[in-house]
Amino acid sequence: MATVLFQKTNERYTDQNEVSAFLASRGVLYEQWDVSKLPAELVDTYTLTDADKQTILDTFQSEITDVSERRGYQTADIISLSDATPNLDELLVNFQKEHHHTDDEVRFIVSGHGVFAIQDDEVGYYNIELNPGDLISVPVNTRHYFTLQEDRKVVAVRIFVTTDGWVPIYEKDPIETAN
């Protein structure tokens, strides 16, 4: 279950009703999907073959189809990051640059953990700390960045409006990220 950490105050929301209400008030879609149906051999597996990735997509196809039909998404893929990922640190540098997209940024956490830090005019930056089973959709044109938690591992389903995939728009100088 996700938590929300406010970077300015270090206040943290852990109650799921509070988390859901806050994210909804910011236009962030938040859902929880059942990860217990993931095949046992893929739980906490971060080096994935193409067949493994397809198995994950197939396992969650009904959920992917449901959210896609509701929100106009067209395609999905799998990203897996861990210390075994070539050039992990360079990838994280790109993800940690503040950016936005011309479509929603949708992620479902299958294994591991991730953090989306979202810029908000009212509360400043807040971190959405994601765990297995959490799905979020960062709204179009919302400034944010992504990083990993201390375990430096995540497997996520990425869902896109177009087949262009992840297309960041950088407009500002890099910011110092806070976890």
Curated annotation (Swiss-Prot):
May play a role in transmitting local conformational changes, annotated site positions: D104
Annotated residues for binding of Ni(2+): H99, H101, E105, H144
The protein's required cofactors: Fe(2+); Ni(2+)
Keyword line: Amino-acid biosynthesis, Dioxygenase, Iron, Metal-binding, Methionine biosynthesis, Nickel, Oxidoreductase
GO MF terms, alphabetically ordered: acireductone dioxygenase (Ni2+-requiring) activity; acireductone dioxygenase [iron(II)-requiring] activity; iron ion binding; nickel cation binding
SUPFAM superfamilies linked: RmlC-like cupins
Disulfide bonds: none
BP GO annotations: L-methionine salvage from methylthioadenosine; L-methionine salvage from S-adenosylmethionine
Binding-site list for Fe(2+): H99, H101, E105, H144
Spans traversing the lipid bilayer: none
Reactions that this protein is recorded to catalyse: 1,2-dihydroxy-5-(methylsulfanyl)pent-1-en-3-one + O2 = 3-(methylsulfanyl)propanoate + CO + formate + 2 H(+); 1,2-dihydroxy-5-(methylsulfanyl)pent-1-en-3-one + O2 = 4-methylsulfanyl-2-oxobutanoate + formate + 2 H(+)
Annotated site residue numbers, Important to generate the dianion: R107
Enzyme Commission (EC) number: 1.13.11.54, 1.13.11.53
CDD domains membership: cupin_ARD (cd02232)
Stored Pfam families: ARD
Gene3D superfamilies: Jelly Rolls
InterPro entries associated with the record: ARD, ARD_bac, RmlC-like_jellyroll, RmlC_Cupin_sf
Note on how the cofactor is bound: Binds 1 Fe(2+) cation per monomer. Binds 1 nickel ion per monomer.
Site (May play a role in metal incorporation in vivo): E98
Biological role: Catalyzes 2 different reactions between oxygen and the acireductone 1,2-dihydroxy-3-keto-5-methylthiopentene (DHK-MTPene) depending upon the metal bound in the active site. Fe-containing acireductone dioxygenase (Fe-ARD) produces formate and 2-keto-4-methylthiobutyrate (KMTB), the alpha-ketoacid precursor of methionine in the methionine recycle pathway. Ni-containing acireductone dioxygenase (Ni-ARD) produces methylthiopropionate, carbon monoxide and formate, and does not lie on the methionine recycle pathway.
UniProt similarity note: Belongs to the acireductone dioxygenase (ARD) family.
Quaternary state and interactors: Monomer.
Record protein name field: Acireductone dioxygenase
Source organism of this protein record: Exiguobacterium sibiricum (strain DSM 17290 / CCUG 55495 / CIP 109462 / JCM 13490 / 255-15)
